[in-house]
Every structure is written in structure tokens, then in C-alpha cells.
Amino acid sequence: MQRGIVWVVDDDSSIRWVLERALAGAGLTCTTFENGNEVLAALASKTPDVLLSDIRMPGMDGLALLKQIKQRHPMLPVIIMTAHSDLDAAVSAYQQGAFDYLPKPFDIDEAVALVERAISHYQEQQQPRNIEVNGPTTDMIGEAPAMQDVFRIIGRLSRSSISVLINGESGTGKELVAHALHRHSPRAKAPFIALNMAAIPKDLIESELFGHEKGAFTGANTIRQGRFEQADGGTLFLDEIGDMPLDVQTRLLRVLADGQFYRVGGYAPVKVDVRIIAATHQNLERRVQEGKFREDLFHRLNVIRIHLPPLRERREDIPRLARHFLQVAARELGVEAKLLHPETETALTRLAWPGNVRQLENTCRWLTVMAAGQEVLIQDLPGELFEASTPDSPSHLPPDSWATLLAQWADRALRSGHQNLLSEAQPELERTLLTTALRHTQGHKQEAARLLGWGRNTLTRKLKELGME
């Protein structure tokens, strides 16, 4: 690849300085600008190979600049940078035709690699997308790298009606992602219909999906449209697809292949144009191996896969999510939003959250009603949060194991506002081990030291430190 010319526009001089030196170190020619008007003036006489632009700047913002650049130089790749890493920023950037989206703070080596990829793209004369989608905003929040990947995928799919499979534990927000995919798609003005396979009795699933004719079975007194007909032109979201019975999987596969189906008890084919988004918390590959899910249907659905991380893998998002849910709960209840004490925020980020984002949302709703003061303290948090297995604790251990008992003690201490837990617990732990080992060896110190994995001198020093001599 030929070395290229890079322009950087950002009102933050430190960002300009860092990028200019990093790009120059990679052998690229870099020119920096403080605002969008300077860039447009320079574009009148010359053009770079790639432009990096901040999204929020005084005067003309990055998206307005991007729009003008795409009108004048539609092939010029533009990378949008932002410290406000949310779904709307990502989708808006892609809608306006951005080459990519770079959330701050970014790894400088990754930024340089992205610039080089954009230059290669430009030099190969590939046309970037110019996406025009209008849709309502969503409540998706996430600055964690895994969530940024999700936002990118949604942005890149915003011109497409391709099938998507969403994987993630219960409570991670799979339906929210499905809504976002629909809202930021060409089908945004058409229906979005959701159906949970696990919530419907097996003998009613076919009727729910495909509808039925009058008299098709006992109680079918009228013709009824199924979910496919209701979603015609739009999106059908099939949640917990792994629970779909095999015979219904066969019918679904035929609909996906032919674009038509028969109502239960019907003889006339019904044609539909529906985008399928499926979701599951199960491992579908394993279900296929076990013969519980059709392999051909799996491949038909698994065109694009989105993995939603559990909350424990995106802990940096917990404070922002909690503040958001407290605001939402306050609006719902018509009260002033609660505030989180800094120690409470820290405690929330350390919890296990087996119910993921849904559990955090419900906790914030509970706090809005039950917390005594306007500021939420650690002791205000519901006890079951601490009684559940803590992050990194072996939840598979029996309830009377020492690790479980230690975790319960730590939970109680943290709820009471204790600090320096290690300095409090370590002497007691060592004293207990020493006492037990000496009792086991009938006071023989060298043998006790061997059992504990210490040298004789270490054991003697510990006895002195703990006042056990």
C-alpha cells in the first residue's frame, strides 16, 4: 500500500498532537485542523486519502461535516471519533456514510491500523456506504469494547434485511438489540412482531406462527392471522429459538426458503416478506449435535451473529446503566431520581449480576421505591444481591464450604461499610491455620510448617506477629 495523506479535525489539541505524531511515525503525512470550516476550506484545493473527525465540536459538528464531505467527495473515507460511545452515535455515523467509528479513548496502534485500512480502501476505489435510515432512539448503553462491536454491527446492517442470530445469556438485552436492528433498517416503518418460543405451549406454536382457518381445530371459530402475516413487510423476532419443536422448525425452514406458508387447516398459500431475527441463550451448535435443532435451519438463521456479553464482562458500563435506570424509574413513578454514592457505584460493579442488565434495571426500580434517602448508600442495596454468588467466587461450591462462608462474611462487611477487609481477614485466617496445624501435629512446629507450606523460620515469625508464642 502507498503511504497516504491523513487529515485530523478535533477541537482538542491533545488529540491532534497524539494522532499527528502517531501517524507520522507510521510514515503517513498528517495535517490537523481545529474545526470543520477549516477542513471544508482546505478541500477546495486538495483532498486527503482519509479524514478523522471528532463528532462533537463547537460550530459545525462531525456529522454535519461528514454530510458535506460526502456530498462533495463521496469516495473519501471518513472515520468518526467520539467520547460519547453510544448506539445513536455509531448508527448516525454509518448513516451519513462514515468508513468507521472510533470510540475514545482509543488504542493508538488500533487507530493507526484503522487509518491504514481506510487508505487502502480509498486507493482501491471502493465506494463506502451512504445510509439513509430514520428511526427512534433506543436505550442501548455501552462503552465496553464488546458493546461497541454490537453497535458497529447494527450500523453496518442498517441497509440490510438479512437474517440475524443473537446469542446471549438471559437478561442481556437480546430483544433490545432486535428492536434496534429493526428501527435502523429499511423496514423501520413496518411492523416489529416478537414471539417467545419458550412461552407458548407446543401444540399452539404452529397456530401462533402461521395462523389458522375457521374450524381448523376445536375453538377455532374464526380465521386468525399468525405472526408471519402480522409481520409482513417488517421484522419477526423469534426469541428463544432453541426451544422451537423440531416439526415447527421444518415448517419454518420451508417458509424461509419459499416465502410462503399455509395456515393451520388451510389449503391456499400465503405469501409474506418478513425479515427473521432470532435469539437464544442456548448453544445452538450443541443443540444441532444433540439432534434437537435442525442443522439446515441453523445455517439459514446464522447468517450474521451478534453476541451480547453478560454484564459481568462489561463492568465499566454498570455505573452509567444504573444512573440511566434510576432516571427511567423516577420518570415512571413521578419522583426525583436517586443518586448513587461513589462507594455504592463501586459495590455495584463488583457484584455477580447473574440476571444481567434486567436484574440491574429491576434493582434500580426497587431502590427508587425503597431507598431511604436521596443518595443510595451500600446498606440500601437489597440483601439478595450480596447473598448471591459474588463475582469470581466459586458458586458451584457447597454452601458450607470455607470459600462460600468467607464470601458471605465479606458481603456482610462491605454492606456495613467496612474497608481494608484483607488486613482484617488475613491475620484471622493465618491464626486459624496455625492453630489447626499445631493441634494436628501435637505442637510440633517443624511438621506444622511443612503442612502449611512454610519454612520453620516463617512459622516462628508468624507466631510472634500474631502473639501466639
Curated annotation (Swiss-Prot):
GO terms for biological process: nitrogen fixation; positive regulation of DNA-templated transcription; regulation of nitrogen utilization. Residues 5-119 form the Response regulatory domain. PROSITE patterns: RESPONSE_REGULATORY, SIGMA54_INTERACT_1, SIGMA54_INTERACT_2, SIGMA54_INTERACT_3, SIGMA54_INTERACT_4. Residues 445-464 bind DNA. GO terms for molecular function: ATP binding; ATP hydrolysis activity; cis-regulatory region sequence-specific DNA binding; DNA-binding transcription activator activity; phosphorelay response regulator activity. Phosphorylated and dephosphorylated by NtrB. Keywords: Activator, ATP-binding, Cytoplasm, DNA-binding, Nitrogen fixation, Nucleotide-binding, Phosphoprotein, Repressor, Transcription, Transcription regulation, Two-component regulatory system. GO terms for cellular component: cytoplasm; protein-DNA complex. It is found in: Cytoplasm. Its main location: cytoplasm. The modification 4-aspartylphosphate is found at residue 54. This is DNA-binding transcriptional regulator NtrC. The gene is glnG.
